């Protein structure tokens, strides 16, 4: 996002105006003007204040109303008590994170990729799924759908199903698939050369981080899943790398990432046709254990907050085995 730019978003059902001021600092405000509900994003931003396009009311980046042009001087009414909600924001590794909680001091730690401090993504792709947050998270962490959903000459085929065994350990607010050599049927990793190793981390509420190492080179993938509303989610997939030749391959990599995400999007869309009948669902051991952990993590987080106690990770070290 450029300086003096704004962007209208809906996150967690809330209309949000995200912007970057003249000094480069990000901010987030509730979008509807508290006067007559006109989206502030439809107005003008000069790098310091947002001006509503309807009556010219102005708000600073902290949400405080600074000017009401229609007010007559000397009247008792002033703009000082008028505000639109301001949300705490932080920018980490080129991503802007918005906190919706009531107490900014209780905001969780922002997820970051090791080895890319101060870096912005080399490639970013975004896609919207017509699916609820839980089904989207479970769908993207599911290890067994690859040969059926992600069939492609450059990735894998249905005939490439293999037995897999991966070690998992608990990690902050989630779990980690321990460092391992990528499966032989995952061809894209070969672009890095050498002997690549990958580690995959999931943490609440809905963030997946993959660290890939091949000799002295690193690739990092950060996937963040944001609920737009109860039935729609937005996926942001950010890729970082240190291998210089990957920059030359960026058009190919973008095509690959888009194709991969669209395949997931299509399968999510089809799943909704069955889910609208609220069928009973079955999670099996090993292949679906990560999904079980996700629901357990959510329940424990809610209980810990309600009881005012520290979060206790319910995930225990375990090796999972499946075919994919």
Task: Identify the meaning behind each predicted range.
Residues 1-116, 321-324:
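Rieske [2Fe-2S] iron-sulfur-binding domain
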Residues 25, 104-324:
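C-terminal catalytic domain of Rieske-type non-heme iron oxygenases
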């Amino acid at each position: 996002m450029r300086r003096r730019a704004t962007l209208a978003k809906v996150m967690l059902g809330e209309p949000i105006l995200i912007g970057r001021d003249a000094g480069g600092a990000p901010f987030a405000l509730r979008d509807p003007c508290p006067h007559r509900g006109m989206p502030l994003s439809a107005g003008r931003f000069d790098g310091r204040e947002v001006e509503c396009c309807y009556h010219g009311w102005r708000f600073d980046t902290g949400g405080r109303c600074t000017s009401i042009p229609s007010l007559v001087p000397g009247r008792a009414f002033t703009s000082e008590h008028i505000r639109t909600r301001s949300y705490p924001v932080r920018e980490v590794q080129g991503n802007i994170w918005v906190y919706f909680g009531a107490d900014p001091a209780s905001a969780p730690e922002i997820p970051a990729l090791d080895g890319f401090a101060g870096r912005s993504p080399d490639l970013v792709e975004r896609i919207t799924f017509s699916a609820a947050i839980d089904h989207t998270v479970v769908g993207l962490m599911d290890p067994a759908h690859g040969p059926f959903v992600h069939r492609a000459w450059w990735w894998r085929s249905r005939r490439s199903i293999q037995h897999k065994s991966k070690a998992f350990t608990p990690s902050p607010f989630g779990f980690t698939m321990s460092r391992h050599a990528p499966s032989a049927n995952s061809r894209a990793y070969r672009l890095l050369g050498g002997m690549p190793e990958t580690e995959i981390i999931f943490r609440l509420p809905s963030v997946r981080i993959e660290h890939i190492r091949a000799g002295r080179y690193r690739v990092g993938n950060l996937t963040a899943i944001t609920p737009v509303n109860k039935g729609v989610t937005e996926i942001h997939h950010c890729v970082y790398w240190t291998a210089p030749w990957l920059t030359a391959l960026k058009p190919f990599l973008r095509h690959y990432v888009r194709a991969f995400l669209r395949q997931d999007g299509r399968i999510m869309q089809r799943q909704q046709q069955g889910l609208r009948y609220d069928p009973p669902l079955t999670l099996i051991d090993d292949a679906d254990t990560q999904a079980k952990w996700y629901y357990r993590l959510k329940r424990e987080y809610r209980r810990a907050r309600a009881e005012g106690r520290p979060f206790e990770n319910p995930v225990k070290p375990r090796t999972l085995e499946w075919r994919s």
